[in-house]
């Protein structure tokens, strides 16, 4: 874990010029403008809960304090709403229980948005999603992947994953399967496969990290089908805290409109997963 955090911090130091080609996702409809809600009236700080072991979304910074894309987005939302907020670290599997026990007010962590989650909690619109992507070796002039291309070239995927199911269903591929992503990435680097289909965030961290040694790059676009790859993540509140959830949704929209979202995204995703 420390090695992964170090890699994220090194990536975050990439000069701005190197990040110019990063595609910044937009999860907000510019035509859908809700009436601006009033921030919740409170005399105490809003308590955000997070975990510190999932870079680059949330992790412990060099000073030991929580940081990451989700954490800094939460802080920016608080500033936009004029609210005083704190960020408290909990073990990931205890975050929702801590929220329900009133030990915090909002969860800012990589908890997937699902119907089951919404049955017991409120959540903002997603501010991040996990795209699926194809990676290729950079020294080969391979065509962008499509059904024909994938059927004619060796492609790898992690066995038993949504990515394997998607590849077989929509690309009619017969991929070479691997037990984990690290093994599949090593196979791509060695040239045993020509395409690797997997989680865009994990692949972005690998492509920009030392283990890839500059071997590989993304090819083609992103794949975001909810049924396979989920709805993403948003800020999660208790069911009764509708005013807070609505205010956070409004803050996220404004952070996107004003460019703050893009600034934070480039800071934590210099090699973009999209």
What are the functions of these language-model segments?
Residues 52, 128-136, 204, 208-253, ...:
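Periplasmic-binding protein-like
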Residues 23-30, 71, 75, 79, ...:
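Acidic, polar ligand-binding/catalytic clefts
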Residues 45-47, 153-154, 234:
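Residues that mark the start of a beta-strand
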Residues 1-86, 262-274:
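N-terminal hydrophobic or amphipathic helices and topogenic motifs
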Residues 70-78, 92-96, 100, 104, ...:
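Extracytoplasmic/secreted envelope proteins and their assembly/folding machinery
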């Amino acid at each position: 874990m420390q090695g992964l955090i170090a890699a994220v911090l090194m990536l975050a130091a990439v000069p701005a010029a190197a990040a110019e080609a990063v595609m910044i996702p937009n999860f907000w409809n510019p035509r859908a403008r809700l009436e601006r809600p009033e921030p919740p009236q409170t005399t105490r700080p809003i308590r955000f809960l997070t975990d510190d072991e999932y870079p680059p979304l949330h992790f412990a910074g060099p000073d030991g304090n929580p940081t990451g894309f989700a954490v800094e987005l939460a802080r920016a939302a608080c500033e936009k709403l004029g609210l005083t907020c704190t960020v408290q670290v909990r073990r990931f599997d205890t975050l929702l229980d801590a929220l329900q026990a009133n030990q915090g007010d909002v969860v800012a962590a990589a908890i997937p948005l699902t119907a089951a989650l919404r049955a017991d909690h409120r959540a903002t619109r997603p501010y991040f999603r996990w795209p699926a992507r194809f990676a290729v070796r950079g020294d080969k002039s391979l065509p962008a992947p499509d059904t024909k291309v994938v059927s004619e070239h060796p492609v790898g995927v992690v066995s038993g994953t949504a990515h394997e199911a998607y590849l077989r269903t929509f690309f009619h591929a017969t991929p070479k399967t691997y037990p984990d992503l690290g093994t599949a990435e090593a196979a791509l680097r060695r040239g045993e496969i020509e395409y690797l289909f997997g989680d865009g965030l994990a692949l972005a961290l690998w492509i920009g990290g030392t283990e890839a040694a500059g071997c590989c790059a993304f090819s083609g676009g992103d794949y975001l089908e909810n049924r396979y790859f989920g709805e993403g993540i948003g800020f999660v509140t208790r069911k009764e805290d509708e005013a807070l959830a609505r205010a956070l949704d409004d803050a996220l929209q404004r952070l996107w409109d004003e460019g703050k979202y893009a600034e934070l995204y480039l800071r934590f995703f210099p090699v973009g997963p999209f």
